[in-house]
From Swiss-Prot:
Main location: nucleus
GO biological process, one term: epithelial cell differentiation
Keywords noted in UniProt: Acetylation, Apoptosis, ATP-binding, Biological rhythms, Cell cycle, Cell division, Cytoplasm, Cytoskeleton, Host cell receptor for virus entry, Host-virus interaction, Isopeptide bond, Kinase, Mitochondrion, Mitosis, Nucleotide-binding, Nucleus, Phosphoprotein, Receptor, Serine/threonine-protein kinase, Transferase, Ubl conjugation
Protein's name according to its UniProt entry: Cyclin-dependent kinase 1
Regulation: Phosphorylation at Thr-14 or Tyr-15 inactivates the enzyme, while phosphorylation at Thr-161 activates it. Activated through a multistep process; binding to cyclin-B is required for relocation of cyclin-kinase complexes to the nucleus, activated by CAK/CDK7-mediated phosphorylation on Thr-161, and CDC25-mediated dephosphorylation of inhibitory phosphorylation on Thr-14 and Tyr-15. Activity is restricted during S-phase in an ATR-dependent manner to prevent premature entry into G2.
Length: 297
C-alpha cells in the first residue's frame, strides 16, 4: 500500500469502500477497492486470493483492468484503472424528456457484449452486471467492472452499508434458485441493461425476489416446462404462481427499432439453453450499421 496515496472516497461498492488514489512514483490515478469480507477475523480466504490473481490476466479494452492486489492489516485492496463515470450516473444525468442517442445505445451494447464474450471465452462469469458497474470515459468507451468478484467473494444479500443488492438485472434461473447456471445469466443482465439504455428506466424493478419474478412474468408470461424444460422443478418455482400470458416487449421498451426489439427478445428468453450467446448477439442485424471503428476495438 505504501506505493499509493488515497485522494478521496468515491463510493461504496458491493464489497466495501472505493477510493480514488494515485501511484506515488508513476502518478497514475487508480480506483482502490477495499474488500470487507463477512468473516473479518479469519482474514482473506486463499481461494479468494487465487481467484482474484487470475483476474489480473483479463486484459481487454472493454474490461476495467485489475492492476494490483495488495494486503494491508489483513484487508484486501484491489487496484483498478480509474474511470470517473458509471452508466447509472450517466443515465441519471440525461434531462427529462431526452434519451440517449440511438447510435450510442448501439455502440455501448456492442462494447458490453465484446467484454462479456472475452470473459466468457475464458470461463469467467460476472453474475452481478448492472449500470453501476459499467464505467464510461469521455471517448465513448464503456468498460465492465467487478468481473469475477462474485465467484471470489460471493454476492452478499446486502452491501456492507446494509443497502440491499439490486435484483433488477438478475436472471430468472438465479431468482428461481437454480443450482447450476452459466454464461446465459450475464446475457439476461445485459438484455435488461439494453432496455434501460433505450428508456432510461429499469425494465424490471422489483423490491423483493418474488416481486422481481412477478414483474418478469407479467411482461414475458409465467414460464412452464413447455417454454423452459425443467423450470417447474427448480427449487423456488411454485405451482401456485399466477399464470400470466406473455405480453409484448415493444409496449415496455419504446425507442428500439425492430432489430433492436428482436435482439432484446432473444436476450430475454427464459430457457438459458435457448438464450442468445454473446458471440451470436454481436452478429445480430441490429449491429449492421454500427461504425466499423467500434467493431475493430
Amino acid at each position: 500500500m505504501e506505493d499509493y496515496t488515497k485522494i478521496e472516497k468515491i463510493g461504496e461498492g458491493t464489497y466495501g469502500v472505493v477510493y480514488k488514489g494515485r501511484h506515488k512514483t508513476t502518478g497514475q490515478v487508480v480506483a482502490m477497492k477495499k474488500i470487507r469480507l463477512e468473516s473479518e477475523e479469519e482474514g482473506v480466504p486463499s481461494t479468494a486470493i487465487r481467484e482474484i490473481s487470475l483476474l489480473k490476466e483479463l486484459r481487454h479494452p472493454n474490461i476495467v483492468s485489475l492492476q494490483d492486489v495488495l494486503m494491508q492489516d489483513s484487508r484486501l485492496y484491489l487496484i483498478f484503472e480509474f474511470l470517473s463515470m458509471d452508466l447509472k450516473k450517466y443515465l441519471d444525468s440525461i434531462p427529462p424528456g431526452q434519451y440517449m442517442d440511438s447510435s450510442l445505445v448501439k455502440s455501448y451494447l456492442y462494447q458490453i457484449l465484446q467484454g462479456i464474450v472475452f470473459c466468457h471465452s475464458r470461463r469467467v462469469l460476472h453474475r452481478d452486471l448492472k449500470p453501476q458497474n459499467l464505467l464510461i470515459d469521455d471517448k465513448g468507451t464503456i468498460k465492465l467492472a467487478d468481473f469475477g468478484l462474485a465467484r471470489a467473494f460471493g454476492i452478499p444479500i446486502r452491501v456492507y452499508t446494509h443497502e440491499v443488492v439490486t435484483l433488477w438485472y438478475r436472471s430468472p434461473e438465479v431468482l428461481l434458485g437454480s443450482a447450476r447456471y452459466s454464461t446465459p445469466v450475464d446475457i439476461w443482465s445485459i438484455g435488461t441493461i439494453f432496455a434501460e439504455l433505450a428508456t432510461k428506466k429499469p425494465l424490471f424493478h422489483g423490491d423483493s425476489e418474488i416481486d422481481q419474478l412477478f414483474r418478469i412474468f407479467r411482461a414475458l408470461g409465467t414460464p412452464n416446462n413447455e417454454v423452459w424444460p425443467e423450470v417447474e422443478s427448480l427449487q423456488d418455482y411454485k405451482n401456485t404462481f399466477p399464470k400470466w400470458k406473455p405480453g409484448s416487449l415493444a409496449s415496455h421498451v419504446k425507442n428500439l427499432d425492430e432489430n433492436g426489439l428482436d435482439l432484446l427478445s432473444k436476450m430475454l428468453i427464459y430457457d438459458p439453453a435457448k438464450r442468445i450467446s454473446g458471440k451470436m448477439a454481436l452478429n445480430h442485424p441490429y449491429f449492421n450499421d454500427l461504425d466499423n471503428q467500434i467493431k475493430k476495438m
